[in-house]
Amino acid sequence: MRSVWKGCFYKNNNNGLSKSSTVINTMLKKKFTLHDGKSYKSILIDRSMVGLKIGEFVFTRKMGVLHKKKVLKKKGKK
């Protein structure tokens, strides 16, 4: 939680906002680009996002893929 006397953190980069910036009312209904570590993702800000950090809306982790185990077929006995 940030101190009240410091105010909201806001930093605008060349290509988009930083993930540690706080969403404020002046950003409503605007589209911003955020870097997720691999590419830039665009985000449209709505009223439910006000007061939260911008980084909460971009996934930075790669989702794992679950593989099924291979079942070996046994050869018939003679």
From Swiss-Prot:
Its main location: mitochondrion. It holds the Pfam family Ribosomal_S19. One of its GO terms (biological process) is translation. It is found in: Mitochondrion. GO terms for cellular component: mitochondrion; ribonucleoprotein complex; ribosome. GO terms for molecular function: RNA binding; structural constituent of ribosome. It comes from the Eukaryota. The keyword Ribonucleoprotein applies. Belongs to the universal ribosomal protein uS19 family. This is Small ribosomal subunit protein uS19m.
